[in-house]
Amino acid sequence: MLNTDKWTCRHAALALAAFGVESVVTSPGSRNAPLLMAVSRHGGLMTLSVVDERSAAFIALGIAEISQRPVALVCTSGTALLNYAPAVCEAYHKHLPLIVISADRPEEWIDQADSQTMRQPDALSNFVKLSVDMKAEPADEEQKWLYTRRLNEALDCALAGCPGPVHINIRISEPLTAQAEYHNEQFHRISVVTPPEKVSTTTARALANDVRQKNILIVAGFGAPDAALNKAISSLGRLPNVVVLAESLSNLHSDDVLQVSDSLFSGISADKSAGFVPDLLISFGGAIVSASLKRFLRQADIAEHWHVGTERNLIDTYRHLSTAIQISAPAFFPRFAGALNFLNKNCAGISQFKKNWIDIANRRSVVLWHKLQAVPWNVATAIGHVIEAAPISGMNLQLSNGLAVRVASMSCLDKFHRVDCNRGVSGIDGSTSTAVGASLAYKGGDTLLITGDMSFQYDLGALASNYLTSKLRIVLLNNGGGGIFKYIKTTRSLPEVDSLFRCQLNVDAKAIANAFGLKYYHADSYESLQDAVPAFFAGPAPAILEIATDAGIDAAVLTETTTNN
């Protein structure tokens, strides 16, 4: 087959396929021409071309998150690589294996006033697991052996242990489009054998025996759906001395799991807080959205805290860490749940600790419902109506950061197959691109994105890609720009809140929808929302439903629903 004459570029493509990569998101360029030829001419790789590298990287992230497979990125030299940084950083903190491959100029031309040239090796070093630097044309067989090993090291590193992104930098000399015939080239993959993750029955029973009589609070952060984990956590939640708190992003669905939102903690008064403090806290998953939960746990007098996970750092979010159990949650909890259920099988009646949590959750749910019925048109009630009207058809939900993830968490999201948000570093950039990637990877139904106006405008490049599918629906929350800053305590009382924080926007969502070929719907009242929502979900896609609200009213409603009354 006719292919690039650059050995390392061809073998990088072979390595991707050997390690299970199926999707490669590329961006146009000249220096990366050999790489583009290599990946596009490999029959086992599907390429998607996206002009905007920042958007391309978030699309790749969305594909990786939903497919649970490594995804590669290919860019040209210069600042193109730096545009990957936000998504790569998010992937690092969400433990997603993005394989970044950047074309570079020859080493002798760095810092020599040559165009589109910068110091690329280690440019992403703060948020990749490994960086490697190679020439496109090895000098001899020994260097080919070296580069084969480096490609193995990089790809194995991306997938091993706690997964994450890696960076492969390839220095390419001219001519860039030279080609030759190559047949039956193979990549020598080095097999790395690791022992399976396993908790022995003896260890699980020893741990369970130590804590069987303690009040246990399990807190779940964000994570992918996992049937075995869900079953284990549900069984723990049924025990008389165990309370499970989970945010919607944890993707745990059970009547025995209490859903977390800031409104839950507004019902816990200072004089009663001791009754909610566990003897043992067990945490797992990614970052928590609820500031109230974090504040409560950090201030509580908790004697013992276990964190379960494969992160390389010690995760002490709540400042009480006593034990780091370095194994994945799906490997740990089924054994631990089995042991604790066996030891507590004859326990009768629930603890006062658990009664306290169940009571506050039930009371706050009723209070929240009544409050939202008694307020004028606002974003929280509107989103609640959209979520309630969403079809139960295996739909995935993507949330942007800021107001969207907080407001959506006030509703029950169990009808969705999974719920995701870029909470690795919680940026507002890339939400739409991530949803585009997620919709490409998810085969079970539609993808619904709920996004704020600032996040939406930040990532318009996603709509310009060629990969908007008929399975993508977008709910745009338009409160004039950055309405969350009128709600959060740090900014709402500042005189500059409107001029410097909200950055009030005049987003013409209808014109944007028309420009990019999306069906458009609009709601600015309960009546218009009731008319728009059925058509939005039943009509053609991709589509945008713009919900226009007043930022001041939204802030007042959110403040009211998270106060203790």
What kind of feature is each model-predicted range?
Residues I101, E108-P121, V407-N565:
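Thiamine diphosphate
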Residues E22-T26, M46-L48, I66-R105, V277-G285, ...:
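A short, small-residue-rich loop immediately preceding and capping a beta-strand
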Residues D122, P163-P165, I170-S200, A532-N565:
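Glycine/aspartate-rich loop-and-adjacent alpha/beta segment that forms the canonical ThDP
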Residues S102-A154, A246-I360, N466-Y467, K489:
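Glycine-rich, acidic loop regions that bind phosphate or pyrophosphate groups
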Residues M1-T4, M134, L297-L403, K510-A511, ...:
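Phosphate/pyrophosphate-binding active-site segments
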Residues A220-W306, L314, D414-G444, Q457-G461, ...:
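Glycine-rich, anion-gripping cofactor-binding loops and their flanking helix/strand elements
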Residues T4-C89:
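N-terminal cofactor/phosphate-binding cores enriched in small/glycine residues
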